[in-house]
A protein has these predicted regions:
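Conserved alpha/beta-domain cores
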Residues: 22, 27-194
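Short, Lys/Arg-enriched N-terminal segments with co-localized hydrophobic residues
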Residues: 1-19
């Protein structure tokens, strides 16, 4: 309880509050993820198969599973699938893996997906998270879009730790945002970064 926390801080030192973080987070949502299924955004025929699978968690992929020539089409396919398919009726947690922050695709991925279908997205999967500021950037963008578009659903963030930089900053990444719901370890990209 936040009010109890503040009261405890004040009781601890009545004259002044030595430290008070600007980050008062509610616990992130807990979602069932017994199994995950990655679906390339460039293959719409696979969306229906994913919907009818036994996977609890489906991530629609804009990153590694999509060739550079198909990125924009894949984004449009995912927006259409989010709007037209009722994933939640089948009990699916839906995530979209955007392109990493070091690409020119990431910005449009996040804006177009969330502005057009944000109420249908449970989480954004951030690849190659290297620092807490990477997560902070996505968090700030999500907040701005949600407020601007009056999106009711607060979208979570999941981070892929896939680089030596990300691993060395994992503690800071883990506590970087109240939206953060999960950390995933990307073994292949991590090994390549060493």
């Amino acid at each position: 309880n936040y009010s109890n926390y503040i009261i405890l801080l004040i009781k601890f030192k009545k004259e002044e509050i030595i430290f008070m973080s600007h980050k008062f987070y509610k616990p992130a949502k807990s979602r069932l993820q017994r199994s995950e299924l990655a679906v390339p955004g460039s293959s719409p025929k696979m969306f229906e198969k994913a919907l009818n699978s036994n996977a609890d968690y489906v991530f629609l992929d804009l990153e590694d599973a999509v060739s550079p020539n198909d990125k924009i089409t894949a984004r449009a396919n995912i927006i259409k699938a989010l709007k037209e398919i009722n994933w939640r009726e089948k009990g699916k947690t839906i995530s979209v893996r955007i392109n990493s922050l070091d690409t020119h695709y990431m910005y449009r991925d996040l804006i177009e997906i969330v502005e057009q279908a944000g109420n249908e997205v449970d989480t954004i999967l951030l690849p190659k998270a290297g620092t807490a500021s990477d997560v902070y950037m996505v968090d700030c963008m999500l907040t701005q879009i949600e407020e601007n578009k009056k999106i009711k659903n607060k979208i979570g963030i999941e981070c892929l730790i896939e680089t030596a930089l990300g691993m060395s900053n994992i503690k800071e990444i883990a506590k970087s945002s109240g939206r953060l719901e999960a950390l995933h370890f990307g073994v292949a990209d991590y090994a390549a970064s060493l």
